[in-house]
């Protein structure tokens, strides 16, 4: 069985920057490789670190980790499929808390393409 990308109800994609498309591609390829679904829990919606937060620019996405068999393996697969680790990164944010998730974004201070 092949995994797919799902979206939590209410998540918005008001804008998707070129870097955002690359992130979505990496998440999609990771889900397919893992053989289980990955759920995006935040796009351009929600409260983040301010108006210039990469989420609001369509350059960052959060992926649910609580329901994954091994979040570290999912993270590794997303990182494996990112085209350029010099300009993109992903990590497990707030590990061990109710807010734990995989955060993926265009690196701060970089431009893609």
PLM feature segments, named:
Residues 1-10:
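N-terminal, Lys/Arg- and Ser/Thr-rich interaction peptides
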Residues 18-52:
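Extended, low-complexity, intrinsically disordered C-terminal regulatory tails
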Residues 8-9, 26-35, 69-75:
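A generic short-segment signal for beta-strand/edge and adjacent turn/coil regions
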Residues 10-18, 48-113:
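Catalytic cores and adjacent binding grooves of peptidoglycan-active enzymes
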């Amino acid at each position: 069985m092949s995994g797919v990308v799902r979206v939590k109800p209410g998540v918005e994609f008001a804008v998707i920057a070129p870097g955002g498309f690359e992130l979505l591609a990496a998440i999609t390829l990771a889900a397919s490789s893992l053989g289980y679904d990955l759920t995006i829990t935040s796009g351009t919606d929600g409260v983040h670190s301010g108006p210039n937060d990469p989420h609001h620019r369509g350059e960052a996405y959060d992926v649910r980790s609580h329901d994954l068999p091994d979040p570290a393996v999912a993270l590794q697969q997303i990182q494996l499929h990112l085209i350029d680790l010099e300009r993109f990164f992903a990590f497990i944010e707030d590990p061990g808390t109710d807010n734990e998730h995989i955060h993926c974004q265009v690196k701060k201070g970089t431009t893609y393409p």
